[in-house]
């Protein structure tokens, strides 16, 4: 039996539309996946998802296992109540919607993500603490 051919699209997550400087896994990503399905596509090929280092290339990451914090949805963090829309909109992510200003992104987004982490109280969660303990033991 012959295998059925399938097709897909290569689109870096960073290329998704966003008012916060870079595309991420938010509502726009879900809409893109829905559009792919509607168009009969089977695959969404994305570039590596690791954090970028100098040069901001997805192929030059300083971690094999970590995810890129730029792809965390600020809109979801607003919904969760750990950031406000005003805080996110007060950050300068650059003015060119067709390219990513990584210097501004690094400065602004990391401050917001730190605030969200501190407000989340995840470090007080017993399941998270058990996870940390298991990682320390191994």
Each PLM stretch: what is its role?
Residues 2-138:
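Acidic/aromatic-lined carbohydrate-recognition and catalytic surfaces
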């Amino acid at each position: 039996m012959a295998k059925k051919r399938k097709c897909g699209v290569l689109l870096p997550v960073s290329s998704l539309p966003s008012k916060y400087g870079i595309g991420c896994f938010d509502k726009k990503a879900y809409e893109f996946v829905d559009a792919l399905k509607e168009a009969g596509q089977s695959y969404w090929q994305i570039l590596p998802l690791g954090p970028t280092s100098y040069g901001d290339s997805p192929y030059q990451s300083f971690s094999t296992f970590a995810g890129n914090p730029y792809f965390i949805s600020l809109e979801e963090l607003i919904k969760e109540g750990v950031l406000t829309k005003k805080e996110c909109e007060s950050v300068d992510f650059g003015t060119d919607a067709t390219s990513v200003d990584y210097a501004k992104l690094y400065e602004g987004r990391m401050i917001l993500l730190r605030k969200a982490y501190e407000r989340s109280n995840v470090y007080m969660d017993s399941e998270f603490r058990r996870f940390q303990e298991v990682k320390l033991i191994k």
